[in-house]
UniProtKB/Swiss-Prot annotation:
<keyword id="KW-0521">NADP</keyword>
<comment type="subunit">
    <text>Homodimer.</text>
</comment>
<dbReference type="InterPro" id="IPR022890">
    <property type="entry name" value="Fd--NADP_Rdtase_type_2"/>
</dbReference>
<feature type="binding site">
    <location>
        <position position="31"/>
    </location>
    <ligand>
        <name>FAD</name>
    </ligand>
</feature>
<dbReference type="Pfam" id="PF07992">
    <property type="entry name" value="Pyr_redox_2"/>
</dbReference>
<dbReference type="GO" id="GO:0050660">
    <property type="term" value="F:flavin adenine dinucleotide binding"/>
</dbReference>
<feature type="binding site">
    <location>
        <position position="82"/>
    </location>
    <ligand>
        <name>FAD</name>
    </ligand>
</feature>
<feature type="binding site">
    <location>
        <position position="42"/>
    </location>
    <ligand>
        <name>FAD</name>
    </ligand>
</feature>
<dbReference type="GO" id="GO:0004324">
    <property type="term" value="F:ferredoxin-NADP+ reductase activity"/>
</dbReference>
<dbReference type="InterPro" id="IPR023753">
    <property type="entry name" value="FAD/NAD-binding_dom"/>
</dbReference>
<keyword id="KW-0285">Flavoprotein</keyword>
<keyword id="KW-0274">FAD</keyword>
<feature type="binding site">
    <location>
        <position position="274"/>
    </location>
    <ligand>
        <name>FAD</name>
    </ligand>
</feature>
<comment type="similarity">
    <text>Belongs to the ferredoxin--NADP reductase type 2 family.</text>
</comment>
<keyword id="KW-0560">Oxidoreductase</keyword>
<dbReference type="GO" id="GO:0050661">
    <property type="term" value="F:NADP binding"/>
</dbReference>
<dbReference type="InterPro" id="IPR036188">
    <property type="entry name" value="FAD/NAD-bd_sf"/>
</dbReference>
Length: 305
């Protein structure tokens, strides 16, 4: 049995595990994909809200966290998805999709909020030139790209594609973007065309490939937007939370409720990062990870909850 089980190898989970190691506690991190998977998915994304990394790319933060993991000798089991959890006396047991079981004195849940990408729910979304994540913006240079979405990632995606040489149009259902003003201003400077108050109606396809997006305007009428690539960036479905709920932790919607020490209502169970109601930022996730790790250490050593 491990001292601590940490589910999720993102900023919160890795920081929690590293903190535990600092205090002589042996954690095991269980990750459904790979270390820092979400951040690596947007490796090109500019970082403007993490001290010391302002203006750098997300990949540099991802690498820094991986270096921290190796420096402290944090053990991570990758490609291991937790599907069930239960308590046996004072220990917590996790069961995975592969049939393995892990036992720990405490559990820190740091699984983030990103599951599968949300879809538009219209035909031809499975065409090979319809994308949900852009890993290499330079591959789109010289092509016509339509981006659907209005949040941080949609705006940043449209911007970096335009800066990489693509002709970009962004479609948003509202009249204002949800991204920070600084990001919007950068998108404008990059020359991204905007189609606001408009909703995707149909993806036109020919020979199996998407060739245009038909959008309906709220004030009436439709527009056909020719394209070489379509990027859908409207958020993600939440991850599987049934195993979390089975532990009896209090939740609000898709988020786990915690106190200022990252404790849930269930003794021995903590949560940190985007899965909590805190702002969804790497900086906040790392800070919460430290608090969760330190509080878990104190609980393991003293038994005081």
């Amino acid at each position: 049995m491990r001292d601590a089980l940490v589910v999720g190898a993102g900023p919160a989970g890795l920081t929690a595990a590293a903190t535990l190691k600092q205090y002589g506690v042996e954690p095991l991190v269980i990750e459904a994909e790979r270390v820092m998977a979400t951040v690596y998915s947007y490796a090109w994304k500019p970082v403007e809200n993490y001290p010391g990394f302002d203006g750098k790319r997300a990949i540099e933060i991802a690498r820094a966290f991986e270096e921290m993991q190796k420096f402290f000798g944090v053990e991570v089991v990758e490609k291991e998805r937790v599907v069930k959890a239960w308590k046996e006396g004072d220990k917590i047991v996790l069961g995975t999709q592969s049939g393995n079981e892990y036992e720990g004195k405490v559990l820190i849940i740091a699984i983030g909020i990103l599951g599968k990408p949300r879809r538009l729910g219209i035909p031809n979304e499975d065409a090979p030139n319809v994308h949900y994540i852009v890993k290499d913006p330079t591959a789109f240079a010289g092509s016509k790209v339509v981006v659907v979405g209005g949040g941080d990632t949609a705006v940043d995606t449209a911007t970096v594609l335009a800066e990489s040489g693509a002709q970009v149009t962004i479609v948003h259902r509202r009249d204002q973007f949800r991204a920070p003003m600084r990001s919007i201003e950068r998108m404008v400077r990059a020359g991204v065309k905007m189609v606001l108050n408009s909703v995707p109606k149909e993806i036109i396809a020919k020979d199996g490939k998407a060739t245009a997006l038909v959008v309906t305007h709220k004030e009436g009428g439709e527009t056909v937007l020719p394209l070489d690539h379509l990027v859908i960036s409207i958020g993600f479905e939440p991850p599987d939370l049934e195993w979390v709920k089975s532990l009896g932790v209090n939740m609000r919607g898709k988020e786990i409720l915690v106190d200022d020490k990252m404790r849930t209502n269930v003794k021995g169970v903590f949560a940190a990062g985007d899965i909590t109601p805190a702002p969804k930022r790497i900086l906040v996730a790392a800070a919460q990870g430290y608090i969760a790790g330190f509080t878990a250490f104190r609980y393991i050593r003293t038994g005081v909850w």
